[in-house]
Amino acid sequence: MLPGIGDDTWRCTVAEILVLGAGLNGLSTAMLLARDGHQVTVLERDPAAPPGLAEAGPEQAWEAWERRGVSQFRLPHVMLPRWRELMERELPEVLGEVLGAGGPRLNLLAMLPEPRRGPLRAGDERFETVTARRPVLEAAVAAVAERVPGLVVRRGVAVTGLLADPPAPGRATRIRGVLAAGGQALRADLVVDCCGRRSPLGSWLAAIGAPRPAEEREDCGFVYYGRHFRSRTGELPRAEANMLQHYDSVSVLTLPGDNGTWSVVLTTASRDRRLRALRDPDRWDAALARYPLVAPWRDGEPITGVDAMAGLEDRHRRLVAGDDPVAGDDPVATGVVAVGDAWACTNPSLGRGASIGLVHACALRDVLREIGAGGISGDPEKLVRRFDEVTVAAVEPLYRATLWFDRGRLAELAADAAGDGGGGGGGGGGGGGDGGREGGPGLAEDPRWAAGKALFAASLADQDVAREYLAVSMLLTTADEVFTRPGMAERVMRLGAGAARYPLPGPDRQELLAAIGA
């Protein structure tokens, strides 16, 4: 439950709600709202419905379902334990559907070698997750959504703009619905933008004379080279390290999937031209072979080539405080909110987008419970302001921590490419605030970065710290919470301070370049 919002404030009231986008976040948001009694219509521009998993099977979803509006639809994905935890509490039928489609239930701590983690303990179940390839996962979520009363999904409906009341002096523009291709007007008490990282909400608002939302935007700076595999034995490879591992010039992701499939991703800086050779499957495989903790994940049948993704942005959008300095902190519009990636998005290599999106969706559901339908229609500004307050307090710190880590990792990769060896060690994944992009403040000036590196290094030597590091990585706690526990900061720094820049075994940059002939 979110700050200031409790079950005792909820009362069953009904609003007409339009959710834009039938991806993971859109359908999850729609189900949460429909189960509270709201009448929810989801508009999705892609026309094709997912194949029924029970009838067609997961391979049909993987091979035949086209989602042209989702650029990363067949790229590697994983669901974190934070997502599983929320789904188990809020929408457990989704987990059942994923499991029924062949998605495994895994304990990410138990997958580590026993010397790293020790015997499993009470409480280690928090590291469990349920995951699948993105098309299979979306098909499972869609199957559950079809069974939710009060929820209708309309596919093949392209939204082109917003419906709004005539401008009124001193009041924010009141959104009343959307316009669809062909001029169809669809009205609602509330429009929820779940269009993802490519959301055109800012342009739609500008087109009706409203201020654009205040935005922070910059190139994410990473490029991803991913490949899917299928097991020859039906078993997943053994894990020798955490899913995300950092090395000189690259990071490596090893992600379990459904039905004996998995994926591996090599992530580099987009400016690192010499590593663009990783687009070639033979060179990609030659690189992977040089990392002994990852090599077992090569032992499968490749079911894709090397899929590359680049050009992503880190972006944060706020509907309270637009880009008009005269308007100050007034809402840019009422009757519309943005959830998940449509609100803020960042580097996907940490796998946090679905979890943050579900936290955000639950926040919207709780705010609507608090203010009731009278607040939605009678005091729309209250809804926008309250949702902004809750987002800033409970969701934005997750985004800021991820952005901080991205900036630090980019600085490391820039140092690797320059050959100066600066920037700290491998690992990390927690904290908050801002660090520098390439050309910004050095990592040596940020003690939080050194603490994050020490946390990872200490996790290799201490079973308690291994749990703390994994909990931070999986969004189950924060680095600040870890370091305020009695004796933990001293323990981490004793074991991890001064560790090698990259403590996991693997090639240095020159050895990597030689392996791929770059």
Predicted feature locations:
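Helix-loop-beta segment of a Rossmann-like dinucleotide-binding subdomain
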Residues: 114-134, 175, 267-271
